[in-house]
Amino acid sequence: MRALVLFCGTGSIDKAFQRLGWEVTSVDWESKYAPTHVANIMTWDYRQYAPGAFQFVWGSPCCTHFSRARTTGGPRDLEGATALVARTLEIMEYFGCPWALENPQTGLLKDQALMQGLPYSDVTYCAYGYPYKKKTRVWNTLGDKWNPRPVCCKASPCPPFSLEGVHPMSAQRGASKVKGQRRNGDNCSQAQLYSMPPQLCDEIAQAARDAVESRLPSQ
């Protein structure tokens, strides 16, 4: 099976699919991540691959301009950021296979018109072994093949929070005063902040495999 990973970044989801024996083709404009294609997704020629070439497509478009916490770095380019997401959805539609696209649940992407009506699941990273909460929305077409763990909340807290009433780290770099999100001055590294929990990635990869297999003709 083959997966296409758009905005591969640190390769969290790539590794999960590779652990299941999938061939992964990745795209990112940052050469430091060693993607298969170093390219801007807006100009990348995805039609070099035929429809059906991939059995799953994953997208992690940059969340910077969708972040409600953005206070530096110049004006917010919401139009440009939304165009990247539109291009991602265009590519997913072209290949006609199950797909998933993630972005912070607290961001502005979920309010954009192009996302309305798309199926999604919300997850929190702390439920998958990370020391901070980071509520994330995963739009996807995995249907009943993926049943994510409950979102961390007072009614269903993750283990670290239920034991101590606080998450050991914050999902923000630098100082934070968010209640329940930080302890003893700890904060996560940039590498970890830009990664996804392996447990979550493995769960999604397994669900993708199940979704693909359910589409195969019965023998």
Where is each model-derived feature located?
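Conserved active-site and SAM-binding loop architecture
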Residues: 1-219
